[in-house]
Amino acid sequence: MITLYGFGKHFNVMDASPFVVKVDLFMRMANIPYQAKQGTKYLRIAPKGKLPFIDDSGKLVADSEAIVSYLTKQYQVTLDAKLTLEQKAQAYLITKSLDEGLYWCLVYSRWVLDESWPLAQKAFFGKLPAPLRWFIPSVIRRKVKKNIHSQGVGRHSPDEILAMADKSLQSLSTLLADKDFFFGEQHTSFDAAVYSHLCEFISVRFDCGFENVFTKQAKTYQNLVQFCQRIEDQFYQEK
């Protein structure tokens, strides 16, 4: 059986990483049996030092895009069989845009935004023993801030970053329109890729009921909210 390695459930979504969610949902859509192992400890054995990765009877595959490609070929997945070459090209480019743009807005909203950081800190580091819990979060937060700045998103003001995220959300809302899924009535791997990012904004729940400005903005797009609910009703009834 395939083992999927991820970070684990946080904020009411099945994983804090959209890339883990993408692989998880893809396998659910494709009816591929798997088991999940979760925790940052698995970063030590990750082939590329990141999560997710899968172990398929001893074969390790890392990176969500590579994993989906491998599973599609290895298990003859036909989710995208009815898509045209043009639709597949559109899906690829939009997915890349989300991975390189909206993702970093998500990271900013959790790790840099002061109103969100205390809740993210508690979720990610709350189980650390007291000595480590006092300094590890701030060390990692500084590293994440440096990465966001190097990537480029972190060089912008909070309002500019929110506007960047909103542009992606607005574009997705326009593309989805009144359809059930992005390419019609049948879900595809592209829906898994889009949901993996959207759920991290729209489906998140904090115990205190807090919502940051990014989540509030995402929820203004009712068709995207309904899309996430549609996916969850079909594939995540255990939520």
Located regions from the model:
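Generic structural marker for isolated residues within well-ordered, non-membrane alpha-helices
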Residues: V68, L169, C228
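GST-like domain detector, emphasizing the conserved glutathione-binding G-site
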Residues: M1-W134
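Alpha-helical scaffold segments in carbohydrate-active enzymes
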Residues: M29, L93, S97, S171, ...
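GST-like fold's C-terminal all-alpha helical module
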Residues: W104-V225
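C-terminal helix/juxtamembrane-tail motif
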Residues: Q229-K239
